[in-house]
């Protein structure tokens, strides 16, 4: 009997750990942000001054961290380069044919990863309290963009949500869920600017 309980316990532990690896780390959780940071600490990003850093989730209505894209000026080529990294590997660099960006640059150390989870919690509370958005539910952060303006790091969040009561529909073999998306930018005074996608 004791062996049976031990086997059941081991099986349960394996099932729980297996399921947790399937769910992944939320994009704006401490674990998801740490994954992004670790990717940005590796080549080709090491020591780079970025003009934009973007964190991405997977498919629409997913919020688990999938990849990070960084834009930076490449001295050798004299061009802006954009490159995406994920745990699966690194994409080929996308070299811009335009003139180099005049955007302010920033380093990895300047990105306020530690402030993001609390900022997102406050932002979701703010969105939930808005009368214009009372029909919406299930807010998730699908992407996060860091830039620098006037010497300050700015974040722009892509929020996705569903409408109460819409549910899902079936079209052939596909299950369809309508979703809505918009951007939210925190302001220096603690408010939020909401803009259309």
Task: Specify the residue positions occupied by each region the protein language model found.
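A short, surface-exposed beta-strand/turn
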Residues: 78-100, 168-197
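Sec-dependent N-terminal signal peptides
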Residues: 6-12
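Bacterial signal peptide processing site
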Residues: 20-22
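Long, charged/polar, surface-exposed segments that mediate recognition or autoinhibition
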Residues: 91-139
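Positively charged n-region of N-terminal signal peptides that target proteins for export
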Residues: 1-4
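C-terminal motif of bacterial Sec signal peptides marking the signal peptidase cleavage site
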Residues: 15-18
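Exposed beta-strand-loop-beta-strand "reactive/processing" segments of non-cytosolic proteins
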Residues: 47-80, 144-179
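Short glycine-rich, low-complexity/disordered patches
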Residues: 26-31, 38-63, 125-153
């Amino acid at each position: 009997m004791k062996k049976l309980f031990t086997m059941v316990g081991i099986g349960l532990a394996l099932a729980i750990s297996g399921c947790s690896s399937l769910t992944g780390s939320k994009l704006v959780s401490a674990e998801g942000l740490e994954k992004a940071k670790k990717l940005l600490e590796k080549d080709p990003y090491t020591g780079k001054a970025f003009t934009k850093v973007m964190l991405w989730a997977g498919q629409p209505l997913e919020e688990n961290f999938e990849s990070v894209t960084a834009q930076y000026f490449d001295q050798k080529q004299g061009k802006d380069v954009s490159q995406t990294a994920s745990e699966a590997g690194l994409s080929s660099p996308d070299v811009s044919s335009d003139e180099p960006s005049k955007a302010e640059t920033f380093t990895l150390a300047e990105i306020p990863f530690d402030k993001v989870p609390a900022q997102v919690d406050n932002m979701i509370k703010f969105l939930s309290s808005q009368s214009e958005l009372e029909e919406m539910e299930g807010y998730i952060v699908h992407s996060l963009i860091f830039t620098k303006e006037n010497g300050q790091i700015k974040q722009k969040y892509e929020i996705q949500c569903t409408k109460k009561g819409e549910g899902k529909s079936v079209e052939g073999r596909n299950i369809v869920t309508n979703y809505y998306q918009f951007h939210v930018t925190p302001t220096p005074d603690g408010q939020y600017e909401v803009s259309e996608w």
